[in-house]
């Protein structure tokens, strides 16, 4: 389900070929990620050379996978998630939000995850398994 960035497929020596730095992502309205960032477009830092294979975007979508953030040119998945009725907090990102998080200003993804955990902290084991 992953593939190399198209621009790197023919490169045999990978040194210096990562996708590095800050990149914008357009967020899907109504998504968990959009509700956490409270913005239409966000910029996050990256450090990778792989991506979600575009050949699987439609198949993943048909099976409930939400592409909740995409590059401005519409080609790269930046954020993805499962619906909240399937999982209380299932978010993936190509970005590295830990690069910009600070003790007094955590990434919206981290603070959202902590909030999701705290909201379920009082549930019993059987309630957690049933939900």
Predicted feature locations:
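Amide-donor transfer/coupling interface in amidating biosynthetic enzymes
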Residues: 1-131
């Amino acid at each position: 389900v992953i593939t190399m960035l198209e621009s790197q497929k023919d490169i045999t020596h990978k040194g210096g070929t990562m996708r590095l730095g800050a990149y914008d992502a357009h967020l899907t309205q109504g998504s968990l990620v959009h509700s956490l960032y409270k913005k239409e477009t966000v910029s996050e830092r990256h450090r990778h050379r792989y991506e979600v294979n575009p050949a699987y975007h439609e198949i993943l979508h048909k099976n409930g996978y939400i592409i909740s953030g995409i590059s401005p040119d519409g080609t790269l998945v930046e954020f993805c998630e499962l619906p909240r009725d399937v999982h209380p907090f299932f978010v993936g990102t190509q970005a590295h939000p830990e690069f910009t998080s600070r003790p007094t200003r955590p990434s919206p993804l981290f603070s959202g995850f902590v909030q999701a955990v705290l909201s379920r902290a009082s549930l019993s084991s059987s309630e957690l398994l049933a939900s």
